[in-house]
Design a protein with these regions (language model features):
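FAD-binding core of FAD-dependent oxidoreductases
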Residues: 81-89, 163-167, 484-493, 516-518, ...
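Alpha-helical interface subdomain recognition
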Residues: 1-78, 82, 100-105, 112, ...
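Short glycine/proline-enriched turns and hinge-like loops at secondary-structure junctions
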Residues: 62, 133-138, 162-166, 464-466, ...
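Flexible, small-/acidic-enriched active-site or ligand-binding loops
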Residues: 134-135, 139, 159-160, 185-221, ...
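Short Ser/Thr-interspersed hydrophobic loop/turn segments at strand-loop and sheet-helix junctions
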Residues: 47, 71-74, 184-188, 211-213, ...
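A short core secondary-structure module
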Residues: 123, 150, 154-192, 545, ...
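A short, Trp-centered hydrophobic/proline-enriched beta-strand micro-motif
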Residues: 116-128, 171, 515-523, 567
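Hydrophobic, small-residue-rich alpha-helical packing segments that form membrane-like cores
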Residues: 530-531, 546
C-alpha cells in the first residue's frame, strides 16, 4: 500500500480478532501449543506470515500498519505462536537481503515460510544487552571458513527465539570476506541446542556450533548483511511493541471488569478514587505507546531509507511499549488481589508475556538510552544570524499550499519571517505579554494572513496540517516568539465555526483575525472551577436582551480584552448542566469591572471580572438558549488541546540543552539517561498531540480521551522544568535570565508555568476522574 488505508487496516484487525477467538488462545498458551504445525499453517493461510512481504516476492505487501494490527490482536488473545520470532524477523530479513548469486534459495525459503511449511528463527545475538548485529563480534560470534566447496561454522549464538519446534535458523557469521547470512537447518551435525523457557513458556535457546558443515546453497547473502539484520530487528521491535500494546489493553479491560463486579467495605472496588487514578495512569502509558507506534510507522513509511531515524523510532516505541505492557499487567495483578498471583488467573499469563517481550530484543532502559543517543538534539535557540539571508516581504506568500511545501522550506520561511518582523526586545520573554506590548506583532501576522494557522481557509486561516502546526509552533518557540492574546483564535474561533450562525461568524471572526477584538474567557467562578457546571453567574431574559449579573475569575489577561465569551446560568429550575448558555459580551458595556490577580511569579496574568446588570443582545447567544453545556465541553476540548501542545516541552528541552552543553553534562551518563527519558516523554507527547490535532482539523468532536493529553503534556512540562532547575544549580532559584547559550534561559519559568497548567482547564485530578468514568467505564467514578 502506498497510502495508509485505515479502513482496510480496521477490517484486517477485525478479521484477526475473529480468527483468534475461534480457539481459546489462553488455554493453548498454558498447554504450550506453540509447536502446533497445523495451526501454524492456518495462520499462514490467512496471510499473516506474508503480510508485510512485498508482492514481488510473493507476499501480500500490506505493510507494517496492517501487521501491527494483527500483532496487537495476537497480544490481546495471547496467541502462543512466535509470530514475531518466526514470522516477522525471518521474512523481513529474507525480503531485505541482496542474495549472494542465485536468488533461488532465498526465494524458495521465503515462500516456504510464508506458506507455513517451514518455521525459521533468526540467530543474530552474541551477548546479553546487544542491540545491533555485529556489535559484540568476537564475544560469542560465529565464524565461517570455506573448505572443500562447503562452509564450516564455529561459535555461539544466544537468546534465539523460537528455540524449539523449528526447521532451522537464519544465522549471521563472520569470515575473511566479511559478514554473511546462512540458513542453518535444525539437526545439522555439530550444532548443540541449549534450550530454555522464557517467562511465558516460549521456547528459546542458545546455539553452540562446532565445525558445522553447510552446503554452498546455504549461503543466502554477503553484501549489507548487518544492515539488513538491524532493519529486521527494528521492525521486530515495532511489532512486538504492538503485541505489548495488545497485552496492556486487554489487562486494563479485564481489570475494569473485575473492579466493577467486586466489592469491599460495602462499596464497588471501582468507586475507590485511588484505584481509578492508578488505572488511568496505566492507560496513559498504553495510549502513549499506541500513538508512538502509529507515529513511528507513519514516519518510517514516509522516509523508508532513513536508517538512523528508523532505529531511533524503534527504540522509542519499544521503550514505551515495554513500560506500558509491564506496568499495566503488574497493576492488574495488584488490582485482582491474591487471585491475580495464581496461574489460573489470566492476568498472570499476560504479565509473564509482558516480561518476556519487554526483555527480548532489548529492554526499556537499553532502548531509552539508544533513543537518547540516536535522536537529534533540539536545535539551540535561534541566533540573530543563522546563515540564511533576510528576505523581502515578497518572499513571504500570504497564501500557498503550505501542507504540500517541503517541511524544510516551510521552516526556513518561518525563520526568515520571524527574523525580519519579530521585535528582538520581545524574544524569549518567560511571562505572558500584555496587549499593548505584543499587539504590533499580532497585527503583523494578521496582515500576513498567518494569524490563524489551524483555521480553515474559508474562514481566513492557513489550514495547516497537524505536522505543519507543530513545525510552526517549534520554529516560533525556537526563535523566542511570545504568545499573543489568543483566546479568540484558539477557543472562540473554532466554536463559532462549528456552532455559530452565519451572522455571528460574519460579525465576530473578522475582528478576531484583525486584532480589532481581543477576547477573554469567562468560565471559572469562585466555587466553580473544575466543577464548572456549578456556576452561578446568571443571565435573565428581558425582551431582546439578557441581563448578566455575577462574577468570573481566573480569566487570562482579561484586563486587556475588549470582549468575553462566557457561560451564564439562564435556567435555575433544571439540572445544573441543562440551564447554561454560551454568551458573547462586549466588556465596554456598562456594569463591567475588572480586578487583576497577581500570581506567585509576580505577574498580573489573570483577572476577576464583575458583571452588575450588564445588558447583552440576545443575538449574542451561541447555539440555543440553555444548550451551552455541549458548547462549553467542546471549547474545553480546544483549550485542553492547546494545553496539550508539545511547544512548552520543546522550549524547556531547548533550555535544558543550552545549560547542559555549557556545563558539560552531556558527557554524564546519569544525566543523559534522565534526559533521554524526558526526551522520550516529549516525543510521545508530540505523537499523542498529532492524533487529537488531526481530529480537530477534520472538524470532528474531541473525545474525552483528550484528558490524557492534557495530563501528560502538563506533567511532562513540569518534569522538564524540575530538571532545568536542578541543572541550573544556584541559578535554579534565581528569577532572572541566565547567561547560557545566547542568554535566553529562564530556569524558573517552565516549572512555575507548568504548575499553573496542571490546574487550568480542569485540574489533572479531575481529568483522571473524567477518563476513569467516560473512557474506562469504571462504575462509581
Amino acid at each position: 500500500m502506498n497510502a495508509i488505508d485505515h479502513e482496510l487496516i480496521e477490517e484486517i484487525r477485525d478479521s484477526a480478532r475473529d480468527f483468534l477467538l475461534r480457539r481459546d488462545q489462553r488455554q493453548r498458551k498454558r498447554k504450550a501449543a506453540a509447536g502446533d504445525r497445523e495451526y501454524w499453517k492456518e495462520i499462514a493461510s490467512v496471510g499473516w506470515l506474508g503480510m508485510s512481504v512485498p508482492e514481488a516476492l510473493g507476499g501480500l505487501g500490506l505493510g507494517w500498519h496492517a501487521m501491527a494490527a494483527v500483532l496487537e490482536e495476537a497480544g490481546r488473545a495471547q496467541l502462543p505462536e512466535p509470530l514475531v520470532g518466526a514470522g516477522v524477523l525471518a521474512t523481513t530479513l529474507l525480503a531485505r537481503i541482496a542474495p549472494a548469486g542465485d536468488a533461488g534459495p532465498r526465494d524458495r525459503l521465503l515462500d516456504a515460510i510464508c506458506r507455513g511449511e517451514r518455521v525459521v528463527g533468526l540467530a543474530w545475538q552474541e551477548t546479553e544487552g546487544q542491540l545491533e548485529a555485529g556489535e559484540a563480534a568476537g564475544a560469542f560470534g560465529v565464524t565461517v571458513t570455506a573448505r572443500e566447496g562447503a562452509y564450516v561454522l564455529n561459535g555461539e549464538k544466544r537468546h534465539v527465539i523460537p528455540g524449539a519446534a523449528v526447521d532451522g535458523w537464519l544465522i549471521t557469521a563472520d569470515g575473511e570476506a566479511g559478514s554473511a547470512l546462512f540458513y542453518l537447518p535444525a539437526g545439522t551435525p555439530g550444532v548443540t541446542v541449549h534450550a530454555h523457557e522464557r517467562a511465558d513458556g516460549s521456547p528459546a535457546c542458545h546455539l553452540a556450533i562446532e565445525s558445522a558443515v553447510l552446503t554452498p546453497d546455504a549461503l543466502l547473502a554477503r553484501a549489507g548483511v548487518l544492515d539488513a539484520v538491524d532493519e529486521a530487528i527494528d521492525y521486530g521491535r515495532l511489532m512486538q511493541s504492538a503485541e505489548l500494546v495488545g497485552i496492556a489493553r486487554q489487562v486494563l479491560a479485564d481489570s475494569v471488569a473485575y473492579l466493577n463486579t467486586r466489592s469491599q467495605f460495602g462499596r464497588p472496588l471501582s468507586s475507590f478514587q485511588a484505584l481509578q487514578h492508578r488505572l488511568v495512569d496505566a492507560a496513559m502509558q498504553v495510549e502513549l505507546a499506541a500513538n508512538s507506534l502509529l507515529d513511528a510507522l507513519n514516519a518510517i513509511a514516509a522516509a523508508p531509507g532513513d536508517a538512523k531515524a528508523r532505529k531511533a523510532a524503534a527504540s522509542r516505541v519499544k521503550a514505551r511499549a515495554a513500560r506500558a505492557g509491564i506496568e499495566a499487567s503488574r497493576l492488574a495483578i495488584q488490582l485482582h488481589g491474591a487471585i491475580g498471583y495464581t496461574d489460573e488467573c489470566d492476568v498472570s499469563l499476560y504479565f509473564r508475556s509482558a516480561l518476556h517481550l519487554g526483555a527480548w530484543l532489548g529492554n526499556a532502559t537499553a532502548h531509552r538510552q539508544r533513543y537518547g543517543a540516536l535522536a537529534p538534539d533540539p536545535a539551540p535557540p535561534a541566533d540573530d544570524d543563522d546563515g540564511e539571508d533576510d528576505a523581502s516581504d515578497a518572499q513571504f506568500p500570504r497564501d500557498a499550499d503550505w501542507n504540500a511545501m517541503p517541511e524544510a522550506q516551510f521552516r526556513a520561511m518561518l525563520r526568515r519571517f520571524f527574523r525580519t518582523h519579530y521585535p528582538d526586545a520581545l524574544r524569549h520573554v518567560p511571562w505572558r505579554l500584555h496587549w499593548d506590548e505584543i499587539k504590533d506583532w499580532y497585527f503583523t501576522l494578521s496582515r500576513q494572513g498567518w494569524i490563524a494557522p489551524a483555521w480553515p481557509r474559508e474562514h481566513g486561516g492557513m489550514a495547516l496540517s497537524p505536522a505543519r502546526q507543530i513545525a510552526f509552533i517549534e520554529e516560533a518557540e525556537r526563535y523566542g516568539v511570545a504568545r499573543a492574546p489568543d483566546q479568540g483564535l484558539v477557543m472562540l474561533g473554532p466554536i463559532l465555526i462549528r456552532y455559530g450562525t452565519e451572522a455571528q461568524r460574519a460579525r465576530f471572526l473578522p475582528g478576531i483575525l484583525s486584532g480589532e477584538a481581543v477576547w477573554a474567557q469567562g468560565y471559572s467562578e469562585p466555587n466553580a472551577g473544575s466543577d464548572l457546571a456549578s456556576l452561578r453567574c446568571e443571565a435573565v431574559i428581558d425582551g431582546d436582551e439578557l441581563v448578566v449579573t455575577g462574577q468570573k475569575t481566573w480569566s487570562t489577561l482579561a484586563q486587556d480584552a475588549t470582549h468575553m465569551f462566557m457561560l451564564v446560568r439562564t435556567d435555575k429550575t433544571v439540572k445544573k448542566q441543562a440551564g447554561i448558555s454560551f454568551l458573547l459580551v462586549d466588556l465596554a458595556s456598562p456594569g463591567v469591572s475588572r480586578r487583576p490577580i497577581r500570581t506567585l511569579s509576580g505577574h498580573e496574568e489573570f483577572c476577576e471580572v464583575f458583571f452588575d446588570q450588564v445588558r447583552v443582545p440576545r443575538d449574542n447567544v451561541v447555539g440555543e438558549l440553555n444548550a451551552g453545556w455541549d458548547i462549553a465541553k467542546a471549547l474545553l476540548g480546544f483549550e485542553r488541546l492547546f494545553s496539550g501542545s508539545p511547544k512548552h516541552a520543546s522550549h524547556a528541552l531547548q533550555q535544558i540543552f543550552s545549560i547542559a552543553r555549557q556545563r558539560g553534562l552531556l558527557a554524564d551518563p546519569a544525566f543523559t539517561d534522565r534526559l533521554a527519558e524526558l526526551r522520550l516523554d516529549s516525543a510521545d507527547l508530540t505523537a499523542m498531540y498529532r492524533v487529537f490535532a488531526d481530529l480537530a482539523r477534520a472538524g470532528r468532536p474531541l473525545p474525552p480521551e483528550l484528558s490524557l493529553l492534557k495530563i501528560w503534556a502538563t506533567e511532562t512540562h513540569e518534569r522538564l522544568g524540575a530538571l532545568l532547575i536542578q541543572i541550573a544549580e544556584e541559578y535554579g532559584g534565581a528569577a532572572m535570565r541566565l547567561g547560557y547559550g545566547n542568554g535566553n534561559v529562564h530556569a524558573l519559568a517552565p516549572y512555575v508555568n507548568a504548575l499553573a497548567a496542571t490546574i487550568f482547564s480542569g485540574t489533572n485530578e479531575i481529568q483522571r476522574n473524567i477518563y476513569a468514568k467516560q473512557v474506562l467505564g469504571l462504575q462509581g467514578a
